[in-house]
Amino acid sequence: MTERLLVGVIVGSHGVRGLVRVKSFTQDEMALCDYGPLSDETGTRRFAVEVRNQAKGVVICQIPGVSDRTAADALKGTRLFLDRAALPADALEEDEYYHADLIGLPVDLVDGGRLGVVHSVHDFGAGDMLEVTLAQGRRSVLLPFTKAVVPLVDVKAGRLVADPPLGLLDDTRPPAGVEGEVEEDPGVGIDEDGDGKGGAS
């Protein structure tokens, strides 16, 4: 498990007054800053990000000290991290997991063989879905994150076991990215009620 959780990435500027567009990986996109200051990948630069608005697929944010488009554009591609210690110590219950701990885990099939790797976690309103990049190429499939479909989650051992419904693997698509630019680790999901967790049901 990582000590710092990826919660978003700056994908570009917005307007001419220093606002930035952030792809938020929190379950509630507007909760990006609810847990305190964020930092870059090195942990040396901290950002007191302020969420101002929401647009299609992104949140519009202000960062103190960033006052024009040039400065905002210079931050493009910056990944934003949150210290795990900033989350409530008792946030997780049984069968609940931080999405960041699932990202990158290999997914094996119950009958043997490797299905792929968890690319991201989505919530389209009917429960969490795992987007798994298939082992044989850059295609992906969405798996319902339920005990029936994902009977084993072992974060400490670093693996998941899946039992996809018949025909589900026929519905594949390219992995999700950010405007074709950001496809690496999407990061943590933080529940909209502020407890920073997700899980199989």
Curated annotation (Swiss-Prot):
Its main location: cytoplasm. It comes from the Bacteria. InterPro entries: PRC_barrel-like_sf (IPR011033), PRC_RimM (IPR056792), RimM (IPR011961), RimM_N (IPR002676), RimM_N_sf (IPR036976), Transl_B-barrel_sf (IPR009000). It comes from Rhodospirillum rubrum (strain ATCC 11170 / ATH 1.1.1 / DSM 467 / LMG 4362 / NCIMB 8255 / S1). It is found in: Cytoplasm. Keywords: Chaperone, Cytoplasm, Ribosome biogenesis, rRNA processing. This is Ribosome maturation factor RimM. Binds ribosomal protein uS19. GO terms for molecular function: ribosome binding. Disulfide bonds: none annotated.
